[in-house]
Amino acid sequence: MAAKKSGASKELSPMMRQYLDVKKQYADYLLLFRVGDFYETFFDDAATISAAVNIVLTRRSNGSAPDIPMAGFPYHASEGYIARLVRKGFKVAVCEQVEDPAEAKGIVKREITEIVTPGVTYSDSILEDRHNNYLAAVAFLKEGRTPVAGIAYLDVTTAEFRIASLPPHSLRDTILSLGPAELLVSSSEKSRLEDLVRGYATGMLVTGLDDWMFSEEQAETVLSRQFRTHSLKGFGIEGNRAGRVAAGVVLQYLDETRQSRRAYITRISEMQGGEFMTLDLQTKRNLEIVSSMQDGSPHGSLLQVMDRTVNPMGARLIRRWLQRPLRVAEAIAERHDGVEELLQSSELSEGVRCSLSEINDLERSLARIATFRTSPREVLQMGRSLAVFPQLRDLLLPALSARLRSLAAVLQPLPELVSEIERSVDPECGATVRDGGYIRSGCNDELDELRSVSSMAKERLMDIQREEREKTGISSLKVQYNRVFGYYIEISRANLDRVPEGYMKKQTLVNAERYTIPALKAYEEKILNAEERSLRLEAEIFQALCASIAERAASIQESALAIAEIDTLASFALSAKEYGYCKPEMKEHEGLLITEGRHPVLERIMKPDEPFVKNDCHFDGQQRMLMITGPNMAGKSSYLRQTGLIVLLAQAGSFVPAERAEIGMVDRIFTRVGASDNLASGESTFLVEMNEAASILNNATSSSLILLDEIGRGTSTFDGMSIAWSMSEYIITRLGARTLFATHYHELSELEERLPGVVNYNATVVESGERVIFLRKIVRGSTDNSYGIEVARMAGMPNEVIERAREIMSGLERKDVSFADRSFSVQENMQISLFDEVDSRLKTALQDLDLERLTPIEALLELEKLQKLLRGHS
C-alpha cells in the first residue's frame, strides 16, 4: 500500500481515509470503491487492475497529499471486468455507496456489499455451465499416530457438498482430479500445498486462512448451525473427523465472504472410496477423459464424444460419471438397464429428451434465487421448468427399468409453487428488477392501486401539457422527465419571450430552457411517491416469492439430481444407438473379454473412407499379462487406451464400443503411457516414468487393470530392459493384475516361456519391398522388427539419411560395420572388425547402444565415438 500511516495520512482527503479503512479489513482483495458512476481502485490495486484488464492507470488529486495511482471502470460494465479479474485468480471486494450522495452529510457512507472469489461466485460471466465450480478445503489431523488429510468441496452454485479422508500421499492426485477453482488451507500449510500442486494445477487459487479456523470445535459449531442439528449422524459423516474439519473451514469462508444466505445448502455426504473406481491424475490425462493431451481442450476427449446431454445439469453429471466410474455391480447394472430401455424405445427416448430441453439449470437457478441474486425472468423460468415435471414423470413411471422408475418417483411437481410463480410474475417481465413492472397485475391489491395512481397522474400531466400550450400559445411546449431533474416543462429558445411569470427555471440548455410550475411539482411528487412505493412493494413481493422457492430447496435439488441422471442415461443411450455400442456384461471374476473392440474417440474422428480396425482383448486365469511388440504407429498405444476406455465406460454405466464385452470388475486403472520432463519439479523424463511405475507397483491389486507403454526407454537399453523385465515378474508373481504391456524390447517376449500368465501379442505389419503397411491389428505371437527406419521415412526424413540409416542398420545386424563416410574424414573403404579389439571398453560401448532409440544422425555420431576409441588403441 502506497499510503503511509504517519502524519502523512492526516493529509489524505476524507474519501481516501475512508478507502484505506475499508482496505485494511480486506487487504487480500482487490477493492472496487464506488465513486459516482464508477468503480475506482487506488494505490497497488490500481496498478494490478490496470495490468490485469488493460485499463488506463492514472492519478488522482489527494488534498494536500501527493497524487495517488488510480484506475477504474463504469459501474454498468462491472460484471465483465469482475469476471475477467476472478478468472485470473483475483479475489474482489465491492464497496458500494449506501446512501444518496445528494442527501449525505459529509462523506458518502459506503459498505462492502459483495465479495467474489474464484470459488465463491454465482455469475454466469465467470461460471461454465457444463463444469462444476468447486471451493475446496484441506485439513490435517492425526488419528492415533497416523496423519490423515481431510478434504471438503462445495459448489455454491449447485449445493453439492462432499467430504473425504485420505492418506497425505494421495492428496495431490485428489486435489488435481477434483480441479477446484479455489483451495483453502491454513496459513502455516500454504507454502507446502502450493509446492505440492506447482507445475500441475493451472488457474487454481490457494487461499491461506488463520490456523484457528481449522479446529474440530469450530467445525462442529458451524456445521451444526448450517444444518440445524445437534448431530451429524444423519448425514453419515460422524466418523470422518478430518473431513468435517475441512467442511467447517468451507462454511467459515462463506461467512468471511459474506455468503449469509445459504439455507439452500441442505445436505453433506462422504465420498466413499469403495463405491468408485480409482483413477489417478496420470490415468485421467493419458486416457484423455475430459481433455486432450495435445492442447488441454475438450476436443478429442472421451467427454466430447459421449456428452449428448441437453441440460447443463446432465452435462456436469456425465463429466463426473466419466471421471468416477462405479465399482458396485448392482448400481452399474441399474444404469445399464436404464440405458437399454431408452435405447430400445425411440418414442420414450425422444419424449424424455424433449422434456429435458424445456427444463432450466435448476441447480444454479435455485442458488441464485435463494441468495436473491436472481431476476424475474429466471424465477419465471423456474416455474416453467417445474411445470414440466408431471409430463416427464408420466413418461418414466411405466418403465421396466427400476432405475428409471425410481428417478421418476423423485420428481416432485410442486403445483402450488408453480401457481404462485405464475400469479406473481408478469410473463412479459424484463431481465432486471431495477425498473419495476415485473409483478403481475392482480397479484397484490395495494400494488394495483399505486399503479393506478401513477397512471392517472401521468394522464393529468398530459392535461397540464395541453393546458400550458393553450395558456402560453407555445405549441412545441413539452412536459418531460429524466432521472436527474424529474418532471419539467421544456421551451425552445425561440419561444422564451412567451414564458409566463409563474414559471420557475430548472435547467438551461443550449437550445432550450427547462421550467417547473406548482401544479407540475404537486403531480410529480404524487407520481414519484407512487412509483417509489410501487418499486419497494414489488421488491418485497419478489423477495417473498424467492424465499418461498428457497423453502422447497431440498425437494428441488433432489429433483434436479434425478433430472441430471435421466439426461445422462439418455445421452448414453443416444451414443449407443448412433455409434453401435453393446451392453457390457459385468462379472464378479477378474477376467476380461472384449470382442471386436474399438477406440470410442479415434473411430469418431477418422476419415469416412478409413474404417477403424477392431481388436479383441482377453484376460483369464491363464492370461494375466499381454506382452505386445511391434513398430511405432502400428496401434499398440491406441489398443492400450481403447481397452482402458471400454472398461471405464462399462463401469460408468454406458454401453461400450465392441461386438461383445464381459468385464470383470476393476478397482483401479493405471497407465504408464508416454513421458515428459516435469521441469517445475526438477524431474527428468526417466524419473517421471519411474515415479509413475513405482506408484503402480505400490498400489495395484489383482483387481486392477494396468496399461504400460514403453517402460524403461528413458535410460540405456540394458537398464531399461532390466527394469521392464523385473516389473513384469513383479506384476505377475506379486500382483496378478490384468496388464497390457507394449514394448520395443523384443527380448521381453521370452517371458512367455518363463512366467505363467504372460502371453505374447504383436501389432501386425505387411512388408512390400522396402515399404511396410501398418495393419493396426493385434494378433497372437511376437515380432522382432520395429521398422523404425520406415517410420522415419514416413516422417519426411531426407532420402539420403534414410538410405544411410539402412546401410548402418544392415552392418550392425551383421555385427560388422563397413562404411565410407566423408564427414568423418576416414580412409576410403576402411574395414573395421569390431570384435578383434581386445579393449573391453569398445565392446561395452557397442553393447550399450540403444538401436531402437537412435536416430540415423545419432547412430553416425556414436560410430564416430567408436572410431575415436579405436584410434586410441591403434
Curated annotation (Swiss-Prot):
InterPro entries: DNA_mismatch_repair_MutS (IPR005748), DNA_mismatch_repair_MutS-lik_N (IPR007695), DNA_mismatch_repair_MutS/MSH (IPR017261), DNA_mismatch_repair_MutS_C (IPR000432), DNA_mismatch_repair_MutS_clamp (IPR007861), DNA_mismatch_repair_MutS_core (IPR007696), DNA_mismatch_repair_MutS_N (IPR016151), DNA_mismatch_repair_MutS_sf (IPR036187)
The keyword DNA repair is assigned to this record: yes
Keywords annotated in UniProt: ATP-binding, DNA damage, DNA repair, DNA-binding, Nucleotide-binding
One Gene Ontology molecular-function label: mismatched DNA binding
A Pfam family annotated for this UniProt entry: MutS_II
Gene Ontology CC terms: cytosol
BP-aspect Gene Ontology terms: mismatch repair
Presence of the UniProt keyword DNA damage in the record: yes
Chain sites annotated for binding ATP: 630-637
Entries under HAMAP family matching the protein: MutS (MF_00096)
Protein family: Belongs to the DNA mismatch repair MutS family.
Function field: This protein is involved in the repair of mismatches in DNA. It is possible that it carries out the mismatch recognition step. This protein has a weak ATPase activity.
NCBIfam families per record: mutS1, PRK05399.1
Record's protein name: DNA mismatch repair protein MutS
Organism: Chlorobium phaeovibrioides (strain DSM 265 / 1930) (Prosthecochloris vibrioformis (strain DSM 265))
